[in-house]
Design a protein with these regions (language model features):
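Short alpha-helical
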Residues: 17, 106-108, 130
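Asp-based, Mg2+/Mn2+-dependent phosphohydrolase catalytic module
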Residues: 92, 110-157
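N-terminal helical cap/lid subdomain that shapes the substrate entry/recognition surface
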Residues: 1-82
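Phosphate- and divalent-cation-binding pockets in alpha/beta enzyme and binding domains
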Residues: 21, 108-111
Length: 157
């Protein structure tokens, strides 16, 4: 079986951590380049493009800031789910191919997978705009998209 997991819906929602970083970045960089998180697109792929333009105002590498914030705050926002991780272990042990996707930027998604204990179980992980399509392409035909924790736990193991 080839399984594509929606990271935010199945393993742990990264959006609250993303929103906390946006608030922190708006406060931290307000004297360099004003940022109003409420004006950013809810689609994080589009928001990343908006942040690229914002960073040109003197902020620089916002990805590095997001990575540091995520390293510091992920344990507060994201908790491993023992049942979900057990299901991933069983899938992996029987030779299934597992991928995950999120529209979150790469530093946030990658560190979230590590915090949630899922990173080492995956063959492929994709982040940002078009992540779902890239994971499905990498996994190949016949992939099953898992869109909730309940769907993961209901997979035949």
């Amino acid at each position: 079986m080839k399984v594509a997991l929606d990271l935010d819906a199945v393993l742990g929602d990264t959006r609250p951590l993303w929103e906390a970083w946006l608030e922190d970045a708006a406060r931290r960089y307000r004297s360099i380049a004003p940022l109003d998180p409420s004006e950013l697109s809810k689609d994080r792929g589009e928001a990343a493009e908006q942040l690229d333009r914002w960073a040109e105002g003197g902020v620089g590498d916002w990805h590095g800031s997001l990575e540091r914030f995520t390293e510091d705050h992920a344990p507060v926002f994201l908790r491993p789910d023992p049942d979900a991780n057990a299901a991933l272990r069983r899938l992996q042990s029987r030779g299934d191919t597992i991928g995950a996707f999120t529209d979150a930027p790469e530093p946030l998604g990658r560190l979230a997978l590590a915090q949630l204990g899922a990173g080492r179980r995956l063959e492929v992980a994709e982040f940002g705009a078009g992540a779902r399509e890239r994971v499905l392409e990498a996994l190949g035909e016949g992939s099953v998209v898992v869109a909730s924790r309940d769907e993961l736990l209901a997979l035949p193991l």
